[in-house]
Design a protein with these regions (language model features):
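Cytosolic juxtamembrane helix at the C-terminal end of the final transmembrane segment
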Residues: 136-154
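Membrane-interfacial helical/loop segments at transmembrane boundaries in membrane proteins
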Residues: 96-121
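Alpha-helical transmembrane segments and their helix-start/interface "positive-inside/aromatic belt" motifs
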Residues: 1-10, 67-80
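Hydrophobic alpha-helical transmembrane segments
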Residues: 113-139
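Transmembrane alpha-helical insertion/packing segments
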Residues: 1-50
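Hydrophobic alpha-helical membrane-insertion segments
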Residues: 73-100
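Canonical alpha-helical transmembrane segments
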Residues: 44-68
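Membrane-interface helix-boundary motifs at transmembrane edges
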Residues: 31-35, 60-70, 154
Length: 154
């Protein structure tokens, strides 16, 4: 079980790293709208902050009483999956809230279809357009966090 301090400090550092990665990607793409840049960076940072404790817990669970190689792989996979899942989920919520204005009344069959397909479209767009913002800094931070985790397990 990860300590509360490690989870909180790690979440803060992970959020800063993923936010910096998104900022670098947007800067390299020559985005010119500061409010949109701030929103995307905040989205990536919030997703990372929520994901880190979950990914850390899953990695510890997967690598319990195993060799350091397993701990390294578990941290890599669990942090990657949690970060993508939570950031993609936040993106889908924002995407859904934007398009909700044109959707049917809540809790109808049509609304349910619109909710599902809007969310799936948002996740698809995040995978296609958003994941690239994790390269190169996010990938380097992921490797560093995985090595840190594996060393902690020794």
């Amino acid at each position: 079980m990860p300590s509360t301090g490690a989870a909180l400090v790690g979440a803060l550092l992970w959020a800063m790293a993923m936010g910096a990665s998104a900022l670098t990607g947007l800067w390299l793409d020559n985005w010119e709208t500061p409010e949109k840049i701030r929103f995307v960076v905040l989205l990536f940072a919030m997703g990372a902050a929520i994901a880190f404790p979950v990914g850390l817990f899953a990695a510890r669970l997967a690598s319990l009483d195993r060799h350091w190689e397993v701990a390294l792989a578990a941290a890599f996979v669990c942090l990657l999956a949690a970060t993508l899942a939570f950031t993609g989920g936040l993106f889908a919520l924002q995407y859904r809230s934007y398009y909700a204005e044109w959707h049917a009344e809540a809790f109808t069959v049509r609304w349910a279809f619109e909710l599902v397909f809007t969310s799936l479209t948002a996740l698809y767009q995040f995978v296609v357009l958003g994941v690239r913002l994790y390269f190169p800094l996010g990938f380097i931070a992921l490797a560093a966090a995985s090595v840190w985790f594996a060393r902690q397990q020794r």
